[in-house]
Amino acid sequence: MKIDLNADLGEGCASDAELLTLVSSANIACGFHAGDAQTMQACVREAIKNGVAIGAHPSFPDRENFGRSAMQLPPETVYAQTLYQIGALATIARAQGGVMRHVKPHGMLYNQAAKEAQLADAIARAVYACDPALVLVGLAGSELIRAGKQYGLTTREEVFADRGYQADGSLVPRSQPGALIENEEQALAQTLEMVQHGRVKSITGEWATVTAQTVCLHGDGEHALAFARRLRSTFAEKEIVVAA
């Protein structure tokens, strides 16, 4: 069994360098919610050094609230903003001898695209326009995954180790109780259940079916690195190979 481990980088966390030794894919902030040209260059350089797949992490234009503000923008605006961000990272990667492999939207852009078909289409269209060989990463079973497949893109369905799920397989909004799993044992058990058995227990007790092709590790939690190391160790014990 194989699984991809991804982390969002270039967002101002001190753990970026260590996370790059533990994950197989890096989603690099492109300046709209965090990061800038220099952090993009630095993250790309470290990803190449560690043999980690390089990906763009585009966002709504929302540095004030870290890309977590809901926005209702015209699809053509989202298309242009997404193309702008992923094009910038692709060029930075190429200039350093690397290749951008995937795109994963950030924050509220990710969450809204999981449910809003027009928004999902705009993102998928931008990814396809940049490079049809790019992998589009989105929430398992989401509108974004469906849109990517409609454009003929390779898609990668994502699950979260430390997020609570609703009965329909969507994430519990961060504003609601149960959104974040802070207990390490619970997060580890949830991750193994999703990866090995394709299901997750919702906060209301029902089982939801999920396809787990990549697991997101957040690097900004207090015990993020310790959990990442433990997850890697557990995967090794279960003979689950970590690779992009």
Swiss-Prot record:
Catalytically driven reaction(s) = 5-oxo-L-proline + ATP + 2 H2O = L-glutamate + ADP + phosphate + H(+)
Enzyme Commission code: 3.5.2.9
Fetch the CDD domains from UniProt: LamB_YcsF_YbgL_like (cd10800)
Task: Write down the InterPro entries for this protein, in alphabetical order.
Answer: Glyco_hydro/deAcase_b/a-brl, LamB/YcsF/PxpA-like
Tell me the Gene Ontology biological-process terms attached to this UniProt entry. carbohydrate metabolic process
The reply to whether Cell inner membrane figures as a keyword in the UniProt entry is: no
Q: Which domain of life is it from?
A: Bacteria
| Stated family | Belongs to the LamB/PxpA family.
Report the protein name in the record: 5-oxoprolinase subunit A
